[in-house]
Amino acid sequence: MKTYLAKPNEVPKKWYVIDATGKPLGRLAAKIAVILRGKHKPQFTPNVDTGDYVIVVNAEKVVLTGKKLDKDGYRYHTKYPGGLKFIPYRRLLEKHPEKAIEIAVRGMLPKNRLRDRFMRKLKVYRGPNHPHAAQKPEVLEI
């Protein structure tokens, strides 16, 4: 028996809605990364995009446990000498909570050519409303 390798057009894509209210950021991001990659499907193939679309609502209500709000944060470098920038999660969640989820999910995806394709299938919204009702997304409890 040969190993099954999925083709990109063979795997049906579904839409899921996840409510981030009261969910820890890391656990939420890990579950989202699994769905975006398609690892929850039996047809999973590592080099093919077999994942589903994910809509995250109520991004402003995601939580961080312990002292991570002040101690941890988002680091980036401007490519200039001494250009290491640090934004604490408290400030990031106040101004751009959707970006905090996107950064966490991006870090949990493989660092290859498929990562940008996976990230395009992630839609994050600050409040409870989203414009994707036409896709008939399923509510996914995490």
UniProtKB/Swiss-Prot annotation:
Keywords: Ribonucleoprotein, Ribosomal protein. It comes from the Bacteria. The keyword Ribonucleoprotein applies. It holds the Pfam family Ribosomal_L13. One of its GO terms (molecular function) is structural constituent of ribosome. One of its GO terms (cellular component) is cytosolic large ribosomal subunit. GO terms for biological process: negative regulation of translation; translation. Belongs to the universal ribosomal protein uL13 family. This protein is one of the early assembly proteins of the 50S ribosomal subunit, although it is not seen to bind rRNA by itself. It is important during the early stages of 50S assembly. NCBIfam families: rplM_bact. HAMAP family: Ribosomal_uL13. This is Large ribosomal subunit protein uL13. It comes from Caldicellulosiruptor saccharolyticus (strain ATCC 43494 / DSM 8903 / Tp8T 6331).
